[in-house]
Amino acid sequence: MKKIKAILCVFILALLMTSSTKTTTIFVIGDSTAAEKGGFRNNPERGWGMVLQGFFDDKVIVDNHAVNGRSSLSFINEGRWKKVLDRIKPGDYV
């Protein structure tokens, strides 16, 4: 019984160690409401995708693909959706 408990403890520790090093990516897609805006000092406008990273630690990466003036159709037709699909991995979010 002690061996089973020891093996179980080792397994749980190994699982915790591997999961703690994994990062999760949140891919932001959309229009101007989420898009990156230039000129931070002179432009008070911010898309929500710009500030999202501030709500997470270093285990979560926010990858913002939002672009001003885009619709779902133009996002797909311009190949922007494919770029996200090519990079997404299990455990990521869009």
Predicted regions and their residues:
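Serine-esterase "nucleophile elbow" of acetyl-processing enzymes
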Residues: 21-66, 83-93
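Short, intrinsically disordered low-complexity segments
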Residues: 1-2, 40
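Generic detector of leucine side chains in alpha-helical contexts
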Residues: 8, 13-16, 52, 73, ...
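Charged, often glycine-rich, active-site loop that binds/positions anionic groups
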Residues: 72-84, 88
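Conserved phosphate-coordination/catalytic loops
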Residues: 7, 43, 75-78
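Bacterial Sec-dependent signal peptides at the C-terminal "C-region" and cleavage site
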Residues: 3-5, 11-24
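Short beta->alpha junction loops
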Residues: 66-72
